[in-house]
Amino acid sequence: MTKIISFESSADETSVAIVEDGHIVLSNSVATQINSHQRFGGIVPEVASRHHIEWITRVLNDALNTAHVEPKALDAVAVTYGPGLVGSLLVGLMGAKTFALAHGLPVIPVNHLAGHIAAANFNKPIKYPAMALMVSGGHTELVLMREENQFEVIGETRDDAAGESFDKVGRLLNLPYPAGKTIDEMAHRGQPTIKFPTAMAHEDNYDFSFSGLKSAVINYVHHANQKEETINQNDLATSFQNAVVDALIGRTKRALENFPVKSFVLAGGVAANSQLREELTMLLNDFPKTEFIPVPMQYTGDNAAMIGAAGYWNYKKNIFADLDLNTDPGLDFELLQS
């Protein structure tokens, strides 16, 4: 049994977890900063860094105590080194390297995006070849995995990410940050009375685009305000969310038709969206040889448990880093050969 302690601090969650064999979560301590950033309508990097410094030791102690694990029982330290905010990443990275040095443990560098996908193993084992739809505030990508720990981006957003669009529409409607959950709840109370565009629906690729949709929503609201018309926010939320989900489902369907896979993973913060989960479940019914594995709801957001899961992939392939490991804020998926 391999026990890995993992550190995550790429954005506005400070988290430390202990994961066994890549799929058993012994502890997952998370300190969120949502309340601190809500009044700004988004993450303020300097504020995030200060909070990480305040919380890193506390979540570390909590993770160890909750798991009832002594440092000597650990096999390695996994840490997110990118992508993310450089100041935030540095706090987790320094914490992880300090812990590793103090206890003589090897350091495993982990791509934050790979962590989101690896969290599907907390649901059930991913079978390969597999495909993942990675949807978050900063990323919207279709990723093909011919084998474990190997990633090939076959489709990506050309402008805004899906989660970014939710937050921008949320700000337009004066909703609290982050707006995804609130819009999802509103969408269940509204009707799709507004026809918003689904970009690139007929293009022969797997890419996404959400900037046109965002602009259409902004224009709709501005025109209504100019005419002093009352906007039914629930109907707008329903219409907007339908357009986002339609785009995600359409590209996913095209990809599944052209890349037969055994597992399909839904990962990232937007993976918590109820409509997206429901419609992907229905879509996968048309692909009986492909098992749908959504990341469990409690692991869709940023957390260290998912970093431990991805860290286990690297551990098995002897992918370790020296203590001079640095952050890579712009890190994307890498094609890793075994």
From Swiss-Prot:
* InterPro entries listed in its UniProt record: ATPase_NBD (IPR043129), Gcp-like_dom (IPR000905), KAE1/TsaD (IPR017861), Peptidase_M22_CS (IPR017860), TsaD (IPR022450)
Intrachain S-S bonds? none
Which GO molecular function annotations are given, in alphabetical order?
iron ion binding; N(6)-L-threonylcarbamoyladenine synthase activity
Name the EC number(s): 2.3.1.234
Q: Name one GO biological process term.
A: tRNA threonylcarbamoyladenosine modification
Q: Where does Fe cation bind?
A: 112, 116, 302
UniProt cofactor note: Binds 1 Fe(2+) ion per subunit.
Give a Gene Ontology cellular component term annotated to this protein.
Answer: cytoplasm
Where is substrate annotated to bind? Answer: 134-138, 167, 180, 184, 273
Q: Which domain of life is it from?
A: Bacteria
Q: Which coenzymes or cofactors are required? A: Fe(2+)
What is the annotated localization of this protein?
Cytoplasm
Describe the function of this protein: Required for the formation of a threonylcarbamoyl group on adenosine at position 37 (t(6)A37) in tRNAs that read codons beginning with adenine. Is involved in the transfer of the threonylcarbamoyl moiety of threonylcarbamoyl-AMP (TC-AMP) to the N6 group of A37, together with TsaE and TsaB. TsaD likely plays a direct catalytic role in this reaction.
Family label: Belongs to the KAE1 / TsaD family.
Q: What is this protein called?
A: tRNA N6-adenosine threonylcarbamoyltransferase
